[in-house]
Design a protein with these regions (language model features):
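N-terminal export signals
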Residues: 5-25
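Cell wall/extracellular polymer interaction/catalysis modules
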Residues: 26-172, 179-188, 193, 202-205
């Protein structure tokens, strides 16, 4: 059976990324949500092209889910695995502070989360300690550098905050994680990989 036959019927087809047989088998035996996430990762890698120089792991932030849910997915295309983390969205995207993202914005000063594909750049030490700069690749997020949109750790993204308030705190538009989960994101995603943000609403059962 051809690899393309294994992927037939997936949500997003024609991603243009050839996968080893062991990965194709792993993807087909995953959950419905994992299969959709792999399709999205391949599609966005293909769309980003040469702007992404490390293509093994893709981060997908699903802001269609409540902030209490692990909605930042590390999609490992080589191992056929998905690891999900908690991530905060921007205050300008959730002015009611109820844990739901209502809107995206690329406007400076909006403090909102931006939709689209990003390339992860170098680490630096800033207000929140080690952080990762992001370059926006779409018209919907191309102000990311000017807006200082980065990946960083934050106390308001810790599990203790979630347990107390039932939702994460909000960032100024950055992708903010708790300490341990930020370390996981940093090690897996920095240095030329793809981060894609959208409102997908993919629940755990697909």
């Amino acid at each position: 059976m051809q690899r393309r036959d294994l992927l037939k019927g997936a949500l997003v087809a024609g991603a243009g990324l050839a996968l080893p047989a062991r990965l194709a088998a792993s993807v087909m035996t995953g959950t419905p949500r994992e299969r959709v996430l792999f399709d999205i990762a391949k599609r966005e890698l293909d769309r980003a092209g040469s702007a992404i120089w490390k293509r093994d792991i893709v981060g997908i932030a699903d802001f269609g889910l409540h902030s209490a849910k692990p909605r930042f997915h590390l999609v490992n295309l080589e191992r056929g695995e998905v690891q999900s983390l908690h991530v905060s969205h921007g205050t300008g995207s959730d002015q009611e502070h109820d844990g739901w993202l209502k809107q995206f914005s690329n406007v400076e000063g909006s403090n909102a989360t931006s939709r689209g594909a990003y390339v992860t750049w170098e680490w630096y030490v800033g207000r929140y300690g080690t952080s990762v700069r992001l370059g926006g690749l779409d018209p919907t997020n191309d102000a990311a550098l000017r807006r200082y949109i980065v990946m960083h750790r934050a106390a308001y993204s810790e599990s203790a905050h979630l347990a107390k308030w039932g939702r994460l705190g909000r960032s100024n538009g950055c992708f903010a994680f708790g300490e341990e989960q930020f370390r996981t994101a940093l090690l897996n995603l920095s240095g030329g990989r793809l981060l894609y943000a959208d409102s997908l609403g993919l629940e755990e059962d697909g």
